[in-house]
Amino acid sequence: MDITNSIKKYKNSVTRKYISLSNDEIDVVTKGDYWLSRKYDGQLWFYCKSNKNSKIINSNENDISTLISDIKKELDKKLSNTKNIILAGELYSLTKERERYGDTISGLGDKSKRKNLRLGVFDVVISDKLLSSFDEKYKFLKKNLGENSKDLSHVLEHKQIKHSDVNKHFKEIVIKNNAEGLIVRNDSAVYKIKKEETADLLITGYTLGKTPNQIRSISLGVFLNENEILHVGSCGNIPTNLRKDLYKKLVKLKVNSNFQKIASNGSAYNFIKPEIVCEIKLLEFQGDKSNDEPIR
């Protein structure tokens, strides 16, 4: 079993399937039957077992088996009758409040907080038994892992719903009970639905595209102090008329900089005097790229 290749293929296929929506876009969910689960704010890791050898890794083969050995041992025991399997799960920190991504990072780095870590499994990547539909996978996971979140490892609870019920569950789970979001899926599509948030950020630079006299994207940051700016991301989802207006303003503010940043199309950012603040709409802040490498 080629574990690394299987995980990368899975991540690529799942990433293409995911459709991110805000709660104002729930009507986009196509008609049909779905499985709904609460979205946990953690990190994606994979439990991999080949013959008698097992480990917990991510798509870059970073291995945390020794850090969360108790979770691995529990999974080894629960899956003792399974020879080859790869499970996808969300590593999260179980607390009285809503779990946070930062708590997961802290738990991996601080031994005293590690006891709070849990692996909530939500999918079967590969198994000895052919499991073609999510319904079959979920039954397998419930039977072998159970749904008790007090266990170190468990299957994330899913419920079957109609598309017309998504908004009702969003209000109950996310708005009322402060969950990060919802995952709504069937065998054709996976929707990630979250509350839309806004952030006021400095425009720190821009790139140019093939169209003259308009920007392609902007880089964004926040002041740490009077002399330092923290880069927090980039944005290219900008209306055409605003691209033209920003071009006129930003080229006048261009400055020389020792800091370099390359856009996804390979062009270098031009940096400017940090004088313009803009409001950005977003669904989430990410610390990692889709390949699990940290965003720098």
Please place each PLM-identified region on the residue numbering.
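Amphipathic alpha-helical
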Residues: 1-10, 154-198, 245-252, 260-262
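Charged, flexible boundary elements
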Residues: 2-31, 36
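Covalent nucleotidyltransferase
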Residues: 26-149, 277-294
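A short catalytic or substrate-binding loop motif that flags glycine-/basic-rich loops and adjacent residues
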Residues: 27-30, 37-41, 175-176, 195-198, ...
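Catalytic nucleophile-His microenvironment captured as a short glycine-rich beta-strand/loop
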Residues: 43-50, 202-210, 214-225, 234
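Short, active-site-adjacent segments that bind or coordinate small-molecule cofactors and metal centers
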Residues: 181-185, 265-289
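Short coil-to-beta-strand transition motifs
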Residues: 193-202, 271-275
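A short-motif feature that recognizes glycine-rich, charge-decorated loops
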Residues: 228-264, 269-274, 292
